[in-house]
Amino acid sequence: MKKLGLFLIPALAVLLSACNDDDGDYPRYTPLITTVRTIDASGSDYYFQRDNGQTLYPSDKSRVAAYRATDRQRAVIWFNLLQGIQGYDYNIALYAVQEIYTGTSEEVDTPARLEELGDSPASITPAYCNLSDEWLTLYLGYPVMDNSKHDFTLIVNRVEAPEESHEGYLDVELRHNPGSDLAGYTQWYYVSFDLTPIAPLLEGKQGVTLKIKTQQNGTKYLRLERNPGSAAQ
């Protein structure tokens, strides 16, 4: 399971703007949530894939020269468009890469596994969430001091039936385990789940009904429609 970076996306956006205001060298396009795809084993050559399948190749990596990619890691990218390049939908100058938590999905059929995955609450902003064929990306707020100790899993719960269900939607549930982290201030992060393990269950579905235990409003059920868009907010 891949951990999410410790910087908030808005904070990094402000930093980029502040650093580049003087010379005019700053990303002019809306940051995108993407999947990193590696080209070589070292991770030094890579491209990004949007949730709608479009690809972006960073021919100019000079501003992120130290970055080494991990295949299928989810990340937010800041960029400018360059002249087209063969084999990719877009050619870009890459300004920053912010990796986000990249989790998995699974069917759960034992109480022991449910307990292991945890059931800690998290706030959610539905407007910033996105469901594509391959990924479910959520924008979550939760108390945190050491984010590396937090684990998230998207499950299909075969142990407990949901109180709310909708025809044509797969019932899924967010599980959050803070590990040994001590409760700190609530901070907000993108969290993305690979839907490949439950892909057969999603066939023919319009979307998902997400069960989530929130910090202030108890258990909520959110219907999310399939949408290939992947712009970060």
What do these predicted regions represent?
Residues 1-4:
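Positively charged n-region of N-terminal signal peptides that target proteins for export
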Residues 6-10:
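Sec-dependent N-terminal signal peptides
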Residues 14-18:
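C-terminal motif of bacterial Sec signal peptides marking the signal peptidase cleavage site
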Residues 20-23:
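Bacterial signal peptide processing site
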Residues 26:
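Cys/His-rich zinc-coordinating "finger/knuckle" motifs
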Residues 29-233:
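First exposed extracellular module after export/assembly in secreted or surface-exposed proteins
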